[in-house]
Design a protein with these regions (language model features):
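S-adenosylmethionine/decaboxylated-SAM
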Residues: 3-159
C-alpha cells in the first residue's frame, strides 16, 4: 500500500514523518473501529478515514473527541495561543480562513465539513475526553490514537 500522509491546506500537529508512521501502524493492525482523542483541525482524522476507507473497503467507523476550541471546558491543559488567534505563516491561508471564510479550523463545524466525505462513518464528540469517554461504548474500538491533552494526568486518564 503506497498511501502517504497528506497535510492539506490546514494546520496539523502531526508532521508527515510521524503521520506516515501512524499509517504504517494502521496498515499492520487493520482496525475497523478507530478512536482518536485530540482531533485538532482534522488533518490526521481525514488521513485516517481515507486510509481506512481503502483498506476496509468502506467498512469502518471513526470516533473523534476534542474540545474543538471550547474555552469554557474545565480541564487542566494550557491552550496553545496559536489555536486562539489562528495565525498562519502563509498569508494566503490567513486571508482564506480568517477573512474570506471566517472559519475557525479547530471548530466542530469546520472539522465536520472537512470530513464530510465520510459523514456516515464519522462520530465527533465535543468535550473533555475524561468526561466523553465515560459515555461511549468503547468495547468495539480496536485502535486508539491518543493525542489530546498532553498533561500527564490527562494522558493517563485517556489510556
Amino acid at each position: 500500500m503506497n498511501f502517504k500522509f497528506k497535510k492539506y491546506w490546514r494546520k496539523t500537529g502531526l508532521n508527515p514523518k510521524w503521520g506516515n508512521k501512524l499509517i504504517e501502524l494502521i496498515n499492520q493492525k487493520k482496525p475497523h473501529h478507530f478512536l482518536e482523542i485530540g482531533v485538532f483541525c482534522g488533518v490526521t482524522s481525514r488521513n485516517i478515514c481515507e486510509f481506512l476507507n481503502i483498506i476496509q473497503q468502506g467498512n469502518f467507523t471513526y470516533t473523534g473527541i476534542d474540545l474543538f476550541g471550547d474555552d469554557n471546558e474545565d480541564n487542566n491543559e494550557k491552550k496553545p495561543i496559536y489555536i486562539k488567534h489562528q495565525k498562519f505563516s502563509n498569508p494566503l491561508k490567513h486571508i482564506y480562513y480568517n477573512i474570506y471564510l471566517k472559519e475557525n479550523l479547530n471548530s466542530l463545524e469546520s472539522v465536520k465539513k472537512f470530513l464530510k466525505n465520510f459523514e456516515e462513518k464519522v462520530y465527533l464528540y465535543k468535550g473533555n475526553s475524561n468526561k466523553v469517554l465515560k459515555n461511549l461504548d468503547i468495547k468495539k474500538i480496536d485502535f486508539a490514537f491518543i493525542d489530546g491533552g498532553h498533561s500527564y494526568q490527562t494522558t493517563l486518564n485517556d489510556i
